Amino acid sequence: VYIPNGQSVGSEKFEYKMKWLKGLHHYLEVLTQTNEKIIILGDFNIAPQEQDVHDPEVWKGKVLCSDEERAWLKKIEQLGFIDSFRLFDQEEGLFSWWDYRAAAYRRKMGMRIDLILISKALKENCIRSYIDEAPRALERPSDHTPVLIELGL
């Protein structure tokens, strides 16, 4: 998935993001009725928890970290999805996105907004879920770095 960024809380683009999340939730509600094993991954443009943000106080209430966005993510999880990354003990400060404009990568000022959500039926098959930061250190990288999962099926 690519969930729209939302620009800023209260903006038209943010309202569009909220409608988009409502539509995704409805789609997943229907999908879970006939499918037991589902993986949803991509740029969610939502940092799930405070620990997924380099400085939670700076970002509190702002786009990517707002209560509204996190509430929609929680509603999706309540359909039976698990954040695969949080199934494992992870060191602090692991992020998947850094803003170019602030030289954020060099300053370790990132967020984890790229997620892999798995249905509970896949939990026992999840061997590893991690972030590969190596591509972000290349000469002309994306502002995101890959998030990966290993499943034993």
Language-model features, listed with the residues they occupy:
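Active-site regions of metal-assisted phosphoester/phosphodiester hydrolases
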Residues: 1-153
